[in-house]
From Swiss-Prot:
Function: Component of the oxidative stress-induced survival signaling. May regulate the activation of SRC family protein kinases. May act as a scaffolding protein enabling SRC family protein kinases to phosphorylate and activate PI3-kinase. Binds IGF2 RNA and promotes the production of IGF2 protein.
Highest taxon in the source lineage: Eukaryota
PANTHER family hit by this protein: CONSTITUTIVE COACTIVATOR OF PEROXISOME PROLIFERATOR-ACTIVATED RECEPTOR GAMMA, CONSTITUTIVE COACTIVATOR OF PPAR-GAMMA-LIKE PROTEIN 1
Region Interaction with YES1, SRC and FYN, annotated ranges: 339-403
Name of the protein this chain belongs to: Constitutive coactivator of PPAR-gamma-like protein 1
Gene Ontology, cellular component aspect: cytosol; plasma membrane
Species of origin: Mus musculus
Positions of the UniProt region annotated as RNA binding: 827-1112
Keywords from the named record: Acetylation, Cell membrane, Cytoplasm, Membrane, Methylation, Phosphoprotein, RNA-binding
Positions bearing Phosphothreonine: 653
Basic and acidic residues composition bias: residue spans: 479-500
Keyword Secreted found: no
């Protein structure tokens, strides 16, 4: 509604203003200096708003998008599009939406609600009919925007990302750089003064790839039909309703324009709810009203007349009306030409200089180098600010962003064809980045031309432990009341403004009581509010301030973000501490598959820890406290806000998620991860990525088992296998993912178009969506860790096609096709699938979960309001003594387990075998694989049974196996009495649930807690673990475990051998780290470890020997 309906109004009611055009003809005409007798002087330069054009860049609404995406088909379409533009004298520049846009958050919330309903309609349609849904239900496949961005970079199409206000930046960028036209589909663009405005929805490429057509909007025809001067468009847009002044606040004004005699007046109030007039009726009525305004410069008089019937917040509405007029006036006025903000010509990747004055976030305080001290750089005047001041407080300095273009045009600069072989495997941002680190004296040194000489991040403790300069500003005490912190306005101002969103309006529903009171005093009955819940300003929640980020790291992040070289989440996490997660296709009635937002939340938690260098900063703090003979400080949790919508979670409020640090090793700071050039730095990047994906195993780095271009695929599948709840992947589903990734048909999109799917599998569609959500998080983690995997090998067209996966899954699940037939009879391909499956399952063992446990809620964190979030599951109170082993207890599994506070950050470990059962240990190296089957072993120390505190039975213990620690206390199984409510056989075991809604809360753990699945109990110290490792022989064996219960292996087949070893099938007790020594090469692939001098054969032999030694 409101201004967003104006674009549809043009399509339906102004047919003469929509003219079909062929872009190749425009590129040969007078617009670019061409004619009948002369060739065009310049290319037709068009700016494309990718946010409105994603479905067209994807290739259109063809039906196979529901299966997770046909990425090679998309790649072929974009290749044809780039070829057609190059041959037709057209230069495209694609602008992606990388802004958080808190001011438009209420629009995003409504859109997520609609897409969530669409997702349920899609699932229901596929379940009932087994056919693809209609194109009107098109829901972009997960990760589509990032895939399109990487594909455009591959085809040398220039890209950029917005950073604050997407619409303002697109409009300003279009004018500032002399683009001939804008390809988009948004009312904000239609109401601004753009010479040539083309439709993104009508953009079509002919089958032969020679004709590129679209529709052009003639805005002077629209103004003629509305009988409205274009100079009055800003007031017209402000009175239609927009993100600043919503149409709910203008509803009474719109109804007053229609009058009581209007045929629709009877619809004004229905069942005490607000009913807005139809959009086309409102547009005509507002146009008539604006046409009759005598003085358009007197905004006070206009606002007084518009809000004459308002009963409350009139002053606030007047202010927001003026802001809305100013917002659209800034986009409508022609801008004086400014020197490009980034490049001399034609300013790719930059921010517009025309953006209205932006109030900087109070959390940011980045020292800028003095521009006057560098006379070679021209000062760019910024509107509403002082000359030479950038429009944003954290803009990159001019000298750093001026590339040396001497002797090279932009096409040559952005071309990847001339990059040497080693350069093609460098991170994406280093190829076109102006930072030249090769000339630096040290790997962590950054050229002073790019970074300011005085960095507030340097301190005497930064080099401790060889970590280099940290990305945190040391020595500053963070407090809630500190000026410049990341706290919301509550921390600094009036409590009534505590949840105000920057640039957004006050929610109309927040004043429902005030409207009701005013209705008794006024003569005009007010229209009831449309919304029954708080919106916009009342959605947000105040969080603790983020740790200050060093200017060097922030400028690098901003530079890569603007140039489209980095995942957009990263910059917003570093600066604002919040992200928005889009809806994917999920069946909310299916209890077997978790929501993607919850499934991959631990990945994001560890990425947050990497971005803020939690491990290193806390380690330094503890060392300083130890030197000063002080107790370790109690660290405040680092909270990130995640806006998401899924089953049981509304997007109206954010979830507070805590950042986590790796316990196995100290991850280096962000500056070293991103800018370090040493071999150790490259190894640490890879280890950090694998640790985030819970895939830190040697086999993942063995190219003989996992090719580099399939590493993301295997990491995501391994992560899905480790989910601690209900099984996600069955054996045949895992084989289907691997078989389609190795199929030659993957790279034949034409053959895949001819492939017929008789009946779509609803579970397969959801698995595809979950997998692509994992790929999305893998791209996020890869960029956050410094791109250890080359971007060419991360793209999903290297390893996934949704339609091909559906075909393989139907054969594997319904027809029970053997693996060799699943691989089209190719024995070599089947052998590769076996190796990849072994690598994915390395170190994982599976056992059946017997009973769910009821858990009492733990106390909430002190700074969260108790009424905001539901409390989480917490631990069961401990017993007196250590239990030996039992089944059916779930914690978060995987290789890294979870950190649980016993007092702030005095942690013990909760680890798990395969992610289904947890165990307590002092370190990961102390985990064993004894008694990991589904049958519970008899405790060797015996036990007794109590009912209501009375002993009613005893039993003797079994003989101790090897590798024991000595006697254990007698086990007590209580039924009823003080311990009632627990399942029988479960002895006081704390279980920490990290997958859930709301913020992550802590439960208390105790050293007396029992072990799980027959594993050693919690080690009180590292010395105890070391003694056990020395005393333990390598002869402990674990029986073959049937994985049929978890859907990974057939019941009649043994556990596959790892790394091709022979002998009795075994499941290793634990997975050793792939990079347990940072000085070792991180990969036997020379592309991933260019500085290694050993031969591939010798490195593979060493890796295999290490794995075999571990197994023995």
């Amino acid at each position: 509604m409101g201004v967003q309906g104006f674009q549809d109004y043009i399509e339906k009611h102004c047919p003469s203003a929509v003219v079909p055009v062929e872009l190749q003809k425009l590129a040969r005409g007078s617009l670019v200096g061409g004619g009948r007798q002369r060739p065009p002087q310049t290319p037709l330069r068009l700016l494309v708003d990718a946010d409105n054009c994603l479905h067209r860049l994807y290739g259109g609404f063809y039906t196979d998008w529901v299966s997770g995406g046909q990425w090679n088909h998309m790649l072929g379409y974009l290749a044809a599009l780039a070829k057609a533009c190059f041959g037709g004298n057209i230069e495209l520049f694609v602008f992606f939406n990388g802004a958080l846009e808190k001011a438009r958050l209420h629009e995003w919330v409504k859109r997520q609600g609609n897409e969530r309903q669409t997702a349920q309609q899609i699932v229901s349609h596929v379940q009932n009919k087994g056919t693809p849904p209609p194109k009107v239900w098109f829901l972009p496949p997960v990760c589509m925007a990032h895939c399109i961005r990487l594909a455009l970079i591959r085809f040398h199409v220039k890209v950029a990302q917005s950073i604050e206000d997407h619409h303002q930046e697109v409009i300003g960028f279009c004018r500032e750089n002399g683009f001939h036209g804008l390809v988009a589909y948004d009312s904000d663009y239609a109401l601004c003064n753009i010479p040539y405005y083309f439709s993104a929805h009508a953009l079509k490429l002919s089958r032969n790839g020679k004709s590129l057509t679209t529709s052009q909007y003639l805005m002077h025809e629209v103004a003629k039909q509305l009988d409205l001067n274009p100079n009055r468009f800003p007031i017209f847009a402000a009175l239609l309703g927009n993100h600043i002044l919503p149409d709910e606040d203008l509803a009474s004004f719109h109804w007053s324009l229609l009058g009581p005699e209007h045929p629709l007046a009877s619809l004004k109030v229905r069942a005490h709810q607000l009913v807005l007039p139809p959009c086309d009726v409102v547009i005509k009525a507002v146009a008539d009203y604006v046409r009759n305004i005598h003085d358009t410069s007197d905004l006070d008089a206009i606002a007084k007349d518009v809000f004459q019937h308002s009963q409350s917040r009139t002053d606030d509405k007047v202010i927001r009306f003026k802001r809305a007029v100013g917002y659209y006036s800034a986009t409508s006025k022609p801008m004086p030409f400014h020197p490009p903000h980034y490049l001399a010509r034609p300013n790719p990747f930059g921010m517009p200089g025309m953006v209205p004055p932006y109030v900087p976030p109070q959390m940011l305080n980045i020292p800028q180098t003095s521009l006057q001290a560098k006379p070679a750089v021209p000062q760019v005047p910024s509107p509403g600010g002082t000359p030479g001041q950038a429009p944003y407080p954290y803009s990159l300095s001019e000298p750093a962003l001026t590339l040396d273009t001497s002797g090279k045009n932009l096409t040559e600069q952005n071309s990847y064809s001339n990059i040497p072989h080693e350069g093609k495997h460098t991170p994406l941002y280093e190829r076109s980045s102006p930072i030249n680190l090769a000339q630096s004296g040290s790997p962590n040194h950054v050229d002073s031309a790019y970074f300011p000489g005085s960095s507030t991040s340097s301190s005497s403790d930064n080099d401790e432990g060889g970590g280099g300069a940290t990305n945190h500003i040391s020595g500053n005490k963070i407090g809630w009341e500190k000026t410049g912190s990341h706290a919301e306005p509550l921390a600094r101002g009036d409590p009534g403004d505590q949840v105000k969103v920057e640039g957004s309006s006050t929610a109309s529903s927040g004043s429902q009581l005030a409207e009701g009171k005013g209705s008794h005093m006024g003569t005009v009955q007010p229209i009831p509010c449309l919304l029954s819940m708080p919106t916009r300003n009342h959605m947000d929640i105040t969080t603790p301030p983020l740790p200050p980020v060093a200017p060097e790291v922030l400028r690098v992040a901003e530079h890569r973000h603007k140039k489209g070289l980095m995942y957009p989440y990263i910059f917003h996490i570093l600066t604002k501490g919040e992200i928005k997660i889009a809806v994917s296709i999920e069946d909310e009635a299916n209890k077997d598959l978790p929501p993607a937002a919850l499934l991959y939340r631990p990945v994001r938690q560890y990425v947050y820890g990497v971005l803020f260098s939690l491990a290193e900063s806390r380690k330094k703090t503890e060392r300083l406290a130890f030197r000063k003979n002080r107790l370790p400080p109690e660290f405040s949790p680092l909270i990130i806000k995640e806006w998401a919508a899924y089953k049981g979670k509304s997007p109206q409020t954010p979830e507070l998620v805590e950042a986590l640090a790796f316990r196995e090793w100290t991850c280096p700071n962000l500056k070293r991860l991103w800018l370090g050039k040493a071999v150790e730095d490259k190894n640490r990047r890879m280890r950090a990525f694998l640790a985030c994906m819970r895939s830190d195993t040697p086999a993942m780095l063995n190219p003989a088992n996992v090719p580099t271009h399939l590493m993301v695929l295997c990491c995501v599948l391994r992560y899905m296998v480790q989910w601690p709840g209900a099984r996600i992947l069955r054996r045949q589903e895992l084989d289907a993912f691997l078989a389609q990734a190795l199929s030659p048909k993957l790279y034949e999109p034409d053959q895949l178009q001819e492939l017929k799917i008789d009946n779509l599998d609803p579970r397969g569609i959801q698995l595809s969506a979950l997998f692509m959500s994992g790929v999305d998080m893998a791209l996020f983690a890869n960029d956050a860790c410094g791109q250890p995997i080359p971007w060419e090998h991360c793209c999903p067209w290297m390893y996934f096609d949704g339609k091909l996966f559906q075909s393989k899954l139907l054969k594997a699940s319904r027809e029970k096709t053997p693996l060799i037939d699943l691989c089209d009879g190719q024995a070599e391909q089947a052998a590769k699938v076996e190796k990849m499956r072994q690598s994915i399952l390395e170190g994982l063992s599976f056992s059946r979960q017997n009973h769910p446990l009821p858990f009492p809620p733990p106390p909430a964190l002190p700074f969260y309001p108790a009424s905001v979030y539901p409390r989480h599951f917490g631990p069961v109170p401990p017993s007196q003594g250590r239990g030996r082993g039992f089944a059916g207890v779930c914690g978060f599994g995987g290789h890294y387990g979870e950190t649980v506070a016993t007092g702030p950050y005095r942690a013990f470990r909760v680890t798990a075998a395969s992610g289904h059962c947890g165990a307590f240990s002092g370190s990961d190296s102390s985990r064993t694989s004894k008694s990991q089957g589904g049958v519970q072993p008899i405790p060797s120390q015996g036990g007794k049974l109590e009912i209501a505190g009375t002993v009613v039975g005893h039993w003797a213990g079994s003989r101790r196996g090897r590798g024991g620690r000595g006697p254990f206390p007698l086990q007590v199984v209580s039924v009823g009495g003080p311990a009632r409510g627990r399942p029988r056989g479960v002895i006081s075991t704390p279980v920490i649930r990290t997958f859930g809604r709301g913020g992550r809360y802590y439960g208390r753990g105790y050293k007396s807690q029992g072990a799980i699945q027959g594993r050693p109990p919690y080690a009180a110290s590292a010395e105890e673990v070391a003694k056990e490792l020395k005393s333990k022989s390598g002869e402990s064996k674990s029986s073959a475990v049937s994985l049929a219960e978890n859907g990974v292996m057939a019941e009649e087949k043994p556990v596959p051998q790892l790394n091709g070893s022979t002998g009795d099938p075994r499941v290793p007790s634990h997975s050793e780290s792939a990079l347990n020594n940072d000085s070792k090469p991180c990969n036997t692939n020379p592309h991933l470890n260019a500085l290694s001098t050993d031969s591939a054969c010798r490195r593979e032999a060493a890796l295999e020997a290490a794995v075999l030694n571990k197994e023995e």
